[in-house]
């Protein structure tokens, strides 16, 4: 009877250690994944935009993209980029 109880306790201890290891591995993978996502976001944010997109605020130092033109719109108190009825070439 003592050996059966000892075996059960030992098996539970092994399962606890294995599940802790699995959980630690899963957490490490999750942290690695979130770090990768943050790196991708940071890389896209650091790229300087050469032009302003649709409905973006524009000035002389912030030009619109090729298929947009900078116009003053009355309800809005600043110039915005609007479509000039052309399409960008790819």
UniProtKB/Swiss-Prot annotation:
Quote the subcellular location field of this record.
Secreted
Keywords (alphabetical) are: Disulfide bond, Ion channel impairing toxin, Knottin, Secreted, Signal, Toxin
The superkingdom listed in its UniProt entry is: Eukaryota
Is Signal a UniProt keyword of this protein?
A: yes
Task: Give each disulfide bond as a residue pair.
Answer: 51-65, 58-70, 64-81
Q: Which residues form the propeptide?
A: 20-50
Kindly give the SUPFAM superfamilies that the UniProt entry links to this protein.
omega toxin-like (SSF57059)
One GO cellular component term noted in the UniProt record for this chain: extracellular region
| Single Gene Ontology MF annotation | toxin activity
Q: What does this protein do?
A: Ion channel inhibitor.
Q: What is known of its domains?
A: The presence of a 'disulfide through disulfide knot' structurally defines this protein as a knottin.
- Give the UniProt family note: Belongs to the neurotoxin 10 (Hwtx-1) family. 13 (Hntx-13) subfamily.
Instruction: Give the protein's recorded name.
Output: U7-theraphotoxin-Hhn1g
């Amino acid at each position: 009877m003592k050996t059966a109880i000892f075996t059960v306790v030992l098996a539970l201890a092994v399962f606890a250690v294995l599940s802790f290891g699995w959980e630690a591995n899963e957490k490490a993978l999750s942290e690695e994944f979130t770090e990768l996502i943050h790196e991708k976001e940071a890389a896209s944010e650091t790229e300087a935009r050469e032009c302003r997109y649709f409905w973006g605020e524009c000035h002389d130092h912030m030009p619109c993209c090729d298929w947009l033109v900078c116009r003053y719109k009355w309800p809005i108190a600043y110039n915005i980029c609007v479509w000039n009825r052309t399409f960008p070439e790819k």
